[in-house]
C-alpha cells in the first residue's frame, strides 16, 4: 500500500492551517493605486534598463504578452493595444510591500515574509473562525487599507498552500480564496497541478519524473516514499511529504541573519573610461551602505566587481573582482566608497566596454554588537550618516551624495518610463485640489 493511501486510510490529521497570501501582479497593482485611470487597462513593468517584461497585468496576459519577453519584441502588440508601460520603481514597490506585510501582521501572530509580494500566515488557533470568512476579511482589508488585490490559499502544509493559492488566483469561482482542508479537496487539487508547477520541483526534477509518466502532483504522491528518497534525496522527500499533508517546512518566523548585501546594476550603455566606473562604484557603494544602515548592520569586508557584455561575442570579454578588508566594521558610506574606489582602480583594464559593476559587503553584524579599539570616530560617523539619511529620506534619494558619484551620470540605469515615488518622496506626493 502506498504511503498516501496509508495516511488517508488512517484518517491522518489535517488540522494544521497555513495560509499563503500572494499579491496579484504586484508591480502592476502598485502602479494602479495612485492612478485609477489604469484600472482594466493592460499594464507591463520592465526590468532594469527597460530591457524585459517582468510583470504583466491580467489584461496584458490576455493579449499574449509573455513573461521575460524583451520589450522591443513586444512593442508592436503594446502599441496596438494601448498597453501602459512602466520602468520598475523599486522604491514604490518596497514601500507598498511593507504596508501589506504590516497589515497582515494584524491578523495572525505567526508571519513569514517570503518575498516582496508573498507571506505565509500560521492560522492555527483560528479554527473557531470559519477560515473562508476570515481569509475573505483579510483580502478586503488589504484592498481597502493598501489598495493591493491578493489571493489566499490555505492548507495543512506550505507546499499545499502554494497549490491552493495558485487555484485561488486562476479560478474566479474561488473569489480569491481557496482552502484545501480535506483529503478529497487535496486530491482533486493535485490532479489539476502539473508536476512542474509544484513548489520545490524544478525543471530538472520535472523532466526526470515525467520519464516515469509522473505528470501531475497527484501522480507523484502515489509513489513509494523510499523510491522518492533514493532518487530525489532529502529535498525531494520533503516535497513529497508536504504534498501528502505532512508538514516538513516550518514557518520561518525569525529571519536568518544576513551574510552579505549587494548592489549592482547593468549600465544603460557600455562604459570605457575609468572615471565613469568610479562614479558608478561610488553610487553603488553609497547605496549598499544605506541598505545595511537601514537594517542596523555593519560590514567587515567587501568586494568590487566589473564585467563586459558576455552576450556580445563581437567584443573582447573581461571580468574581474577583488576582495577588500575594511579597517574596522562600518556602515559609513564615505569609508566604504573610499575602499571600493581603491578596488576598482586595481581591477580596471583599458580597452574594454564594461556592461555591469557592483559592490558586495560581507561579514555583516548588528551595529550594537560591534565594539573595537579602532572604532574611535563611531559617534561622529553615526551623526553624519544619520543626517545624510534623514535628508535623503525626506527630500529624495541622492539629494545629499558624495562628490565621487558625479553629477550627470550618463552611465545610469535606463528608466525612461518610471512613475513617481508617491509614498517615499515629498516632491512626488499626490496633490488634491479643492
Residue ranges and their predicted role:
Residues 1-241, 250, 378-434:
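Gly/Gly-Pro- and Ser/Thr-rich, intrinsically disordered tail segments characteristic of DNA damage-repair
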Residues 114-118, 155-158, 297-301, 352-356:
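Short Gly/Ser/Thr- and Asp/Glu-enriched loop/turn motifs at secondary-structure junctions
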Residues 11, 197, 207-353:
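DNA-contacting surface of Y-family translesion DNA polymerases
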Residues 335-394:
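C-terminal hydrophobic structural anchor segments
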Residues 315-317, 369-373, 413:
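Short conserved micro-motifs at the rims of enzyme active sites and ligand-binding pockets
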Residues 26, 49-52, 309-312, 364-368:
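Short, charged/polar surface micro-motifs in flexible loops or helix N-caps
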Residues 119-125, 320-327, 366-372:
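Short, hydrophobic beta-strand segments
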Amino acid at each position: 500500500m502506498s504511503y498516501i493511501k496509508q495516511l488517508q486510510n488512517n484518517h491522518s490529521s489535517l488540522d494544521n492551517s497555513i495560509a499563503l497570501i500572494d499579491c496579484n501582479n504586484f508591480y502592476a497593482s502598485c502602479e494602479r493605486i495612485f492612478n485609477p485611470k489604469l484600472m482594466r487597462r493592460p499594464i507591463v513593468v520592465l526590468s532594469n534598463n527597460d530591457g524585459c517584461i517582468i510583470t504583466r497585468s491580467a489584461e496584458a496576459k490576455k493579449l499574449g504578452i509573455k513573461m521575460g519577453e524583451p520589450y522591443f519584441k513586444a512593442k508592436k502588440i503594446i502599441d496596438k493595444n494601448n498597453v501602459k508601460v512602466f520602468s520598475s520603481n523599486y522604491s514604490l514597490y518596497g514601500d507598498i510591500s511593507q504596508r501589506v506585510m504590516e497589515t497582515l501582521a494584524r491578523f495572525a501572530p505567526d508571519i513569514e515574509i517570503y518575498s516582496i509580494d508573498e507571506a505565509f500566515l500560521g492560522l492555527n488557533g483560528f479554527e473557531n473562525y470559519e477560515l473562508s470568512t476570515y481569509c475573505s476579511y483579510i483580502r478586503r482589508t488589504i484592498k481597502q487599507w493598501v489598495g493591493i488585490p491578493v489571493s489566499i490559499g490555505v492548507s495543512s502544509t506550505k507546499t499545499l498552500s502554494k497549490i491552493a493559492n495558485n487555484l485561488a488566483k486562476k479560478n474566479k469561482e474561488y473569489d480569491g480564496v481557496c482552502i484545501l482542508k480535506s483529503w478529497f479537496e487535496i486530491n482533486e487539487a493535485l490532479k489539476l497541478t502539473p508536476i512542474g508547477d509544484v513548489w520545490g520541483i524544478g525543471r530538472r526534477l520535472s523532466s526526470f519524473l515525467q520519464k516515469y509518466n509522473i505528470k501531475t502532483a497527484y501522480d507523484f504522491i502515489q509513489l513509494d516514499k523510499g523510491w522518492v528518497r533514493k532518487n530525489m534525496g532529502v529535498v525531494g522527500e520533503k516535497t513529497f511529504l508536504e504534498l501528502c499533508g505532512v508538514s516538513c517546512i516550518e514557518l520561518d518566523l525569525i529571519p536568518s541573519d544576513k551574510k552579505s548585501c549587494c548592489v549592482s546594476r547593468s549600465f544603460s550603455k557600455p562604459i570605457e573610461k575609468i572615471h565613469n566606473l568610479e562614479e558608478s562604484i561610488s553610487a553603488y557603494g553609497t547605496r549598499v551602505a544605506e541598505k545595511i544602515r537601514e537594517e542596523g548592520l555593519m560590514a567587515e569586508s567587501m568586494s568590487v566587481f566589473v564585467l563586459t557584455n558576455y552576450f556580445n561575442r563581437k567584443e573582447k570579454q573581461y571580468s574581474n573582482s577583488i576582495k577588500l578588508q575594511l579597517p574596522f566594521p562600518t556602515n559609513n558610506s564615505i569609508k566604504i566608497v573610499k575602499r571600493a574606489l581603491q578596488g576598482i582602480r586595481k581591477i580596471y583594464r583599458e580597452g574594454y566596454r564594461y556592461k555591469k559593476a557592483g559592490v558586495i559587503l560581507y561579514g555583516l553584524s548588528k551595529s550594537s554588537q560591534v565594539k573595537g579599539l579602532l572604532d574611535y570616530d563611531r559617534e561622529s560617523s553615526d551623526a553624519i550618516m544619520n543626517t545624510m539619511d534623514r535628508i535623503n529620506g525626506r527630500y529624495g534619494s541622492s539629494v545629499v551624495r558624495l562628490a565621487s558619484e558625479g553629477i550627470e551620470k550618463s552611465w545610469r540605469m535606463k528608466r525612461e518610463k518610471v512613475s513617481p515615488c508617491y509614498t517615499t518622496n515629498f516632491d512626488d506626493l499626490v496633490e488634491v485640489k479643492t
